[in-house]
Amino acid sequence: IGLIFQKSSTRTRVSFETGMFQLGGQALFLSSRDLQIGRGEPVQDTARVLSRYLDGIMIRTYEQKEVEDLAKYGSIPIINGLTDFCHPCQVLADLMTIREKYGVLKGLKMCYIGDGNNMAISLIVGGLKSDMQVSIATPDNYRPAKEVLDFAAGNDAFTLVNDPIKAVENADVVITDTWTSMGQEEEKKIRQQAFQGYQINDELMA
C-alpha cells in the first residue's frame, strides 16, 4: 500500500505502517516531495501510474477532491486518511474503541463539542450509520457542512445545539477536537474566542 502524505501526521503514518506490517503487507511512504503530483503532474496520471505498482493507496491531504480524483482515475482501492471535509479512519478507530468499552454501539449517545470540522462530519455519519444517538454542540458560524446536516435531517437520533452542557446530557461518550486545524493558524486567536466553553473540563462533565 502506498501512503501519500500531503499533510504530515505522527499517528496516521505509524498506525498504517504498523498495521500493514502486522498483517503481512508492506507500506511505502510517499510525501508530496516524492511525487510528480507535487510539481504539477495531473492527478489522473499519478493515479494510473501508482495503480500499476501498488495494491492500494492511503492519502492524507487537504482537498476532498484529491481523494475522489484518485479513486476516479485509479484502478486500486483508495483510503481516505484525512481531508478538510472528513476523517473516516479516525472515526472508525473511535467507534471500535467505544464498542470495546461498551460491547455495542446501537443506542449509545455520542456527543461532540467544538468545531464542526472533518471530525464532526465523520462522527455524524459514522454514529448515525451505527444506530447511535449523535449530539453536536458548536457555534453557529462553525457548523458542519450543509450536505452532512441534510444527511442527518429528519433523524430523531441527531441533535445540533449551541450549548455544550445541554449536548452532553446523558451522553455515554464525549469527544472534542482541536479548535485550530492545520492550515488555519492565522485564525487561531479568532477561534480561541469563538470556542470558549467548547472544551471537555470538570464543569462540563459534572
What does each model-identified segment do?
Residues 67, 120, 183-184:
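Glycine/Thr-rich phosphate-binding loops of Rossmann-like dinucleotide-binding domains
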Residues 95, 154-161, 194-198:
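Short gly/ser/thr-rich secondary-structure transition/capping motifs
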Residues 28-32, 79-81, 107, 136-138, ...:
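Short beta-strands and strand-loop turn motifs
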Residues 196-206:
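Rossmann-fold NAD(P)-binding glycine/threonine-rich loop
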Residues 1-99:
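Phosphate/diphosphate ligand-binding glycine-rich loop within oxidoreductases
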Residues 178-198:
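Glycine/threonine-rich flexible loop motifs
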Residues 6-19, 100-177:
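Glycine-rich phosphate/diphosphate-binding loop of Rossmann-like nucleotide-binding domains
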Residues 51, 71, 167-169, 205:
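A short, aliphatic-rich alpha-helical micro-motif
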